[in-house]
Amino acid sequence: MALLPDKEKLLRNFLRCANWEEKYLYIIELGQRLPELRDEDKSPQNSIQGCQSQVWIVMRQNAQGIIELQGDSDAAIVKGLIAVVFILYDQMTPQDIVNFDVRPWFEKMALTQHLTPSRSQGLEAMIRAIRAKAAALS
């Protein structure tokens, strides 16, 4: 996650974009910064149902109890949305993830109102899947 900004910098950078085209390009750029997901991690158990695009999210807990997320998608904008979600959940324990509400951050970014309904549903599916996996670990 070192290549990605923290939550506050994400919000600042997003709000600096002059228009929605710039914001979409920034989201795509964030997705390009995600580390490559191994082919063996692109498996059915890591696949997120409810997304129009193919999405894989891998969740591992490190020795300190912090969740490490990895993900990929076959769509550039969706891969960027994965990066945004990962930034919001960065350095959290499973219980932190379960308790943390990402929606106020999306509202500050005015993100969801500029996504198509299918992208918004996919974003919600990613969040539900991450929270469910975190709940199983907590």
Swiss-Prot record:
BP GO terms, sorted: iron-sulfur cluster assembly; sulfur compound metabolic process
Domain of life: Bacteria
GO cellular component: cytoplasm
Disulfide-bond pairs as recorded: none
Keyword field: Cytoplasm
InterPro entries documented for this protein: Cysteine_desulfuration_SufE, Fe-S_metab-assoc_dom
Localization annotation: Cytoplasm
Pfam families the record matches: SufE
Active-site residue numbers: 51
Pathway: Cofactor biosynthesis; iron-sulfur cluster biosynthesis
The protein's role, per its UniProt record: Participates in cysteine desulfuration mediated by SufS. Cysteine desulfuration mobilizes sulfur from L-cysteine to yield L-alanine and constitutes an essential step in sulfur metabolism for biosynthesis of a variety of sulfur-containing biomolecules. Functions as a sulfur acceptor for SufS, by mediating the direct transfer of the sulfur atom from the S-sulfanylcysteine of SufS, an intermediate product of cysteine desulfuration process.
Assembly mode: Homodimer. Interacts with SufS.
Similarity-based family: Belongs to the SufE family.
NCBIfam families linked to this entry: PRK09296.1
Protein name (database record): Cysteine desulfuration protein SufE
Organism for this UniProt entry: Escherichia coli O127:H6 (strain E2348/69 / EPEC)
